[in-house]
Amino acid sequence: ELPYISENGSAIHGLNLINQNFPNEIVLSRKKEELLKIFNEKTPERLLNKCVQISKLSKKEQEKIFGQKDDRLKDALKRKYTLPFLFNGNNSEKNKLLKSLSNNSLTLQEGGRVLNLCDNINKIKSMNRIIKILKKTEDKIKTIAVGDNYNDLEMLKNSDVPCLVFNDQFKLDKINIDNLIFSNKPSPEGWADVIKMALEKIGYSN
């Protein structure tokens, strides 16, 4: 078992596995119920009507959206701090929604098949919180960030060794990240590839 960040940076788990003096859990986000209340009260009705909460859809529709069934579908829907939904509007309307959310300290993360309503938090903020804690006991820290989606790009830009795993939505010539390690294999093989290359780059070997 290893430490991990959940729900686009909303919470950090298991740092005590590295050092027993570190916290077991750090929550950086408000609960999804509070976010939903603000969302429903502050979002213009014309935009709200174009938002479909995935939790309110039929199981068959949920399976189609997430590409998962049974326990894996339950895991995909089990959220404490984020709310997945579909937006049935055009790009102009999506930009208006983004502006409305930003004005109310909320954010929207694109996660492949769905959009996620989030607090004003992201993976960079949680990564920086982890680094700050680790620096209490470690002087030299190198961050390796691995991503396979658009909501990972800012995290990659802020890491020492950025790694990108194949995603057919990406066009590499449009991604401006220095020293990017890229795998043209999809996950999970692509993840193993880039991590191996990243460890070699920083001079780590078994």
Where are these regions (language model features)?
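Active-site phosphate-binding/coordination module
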Residues: E1-S55
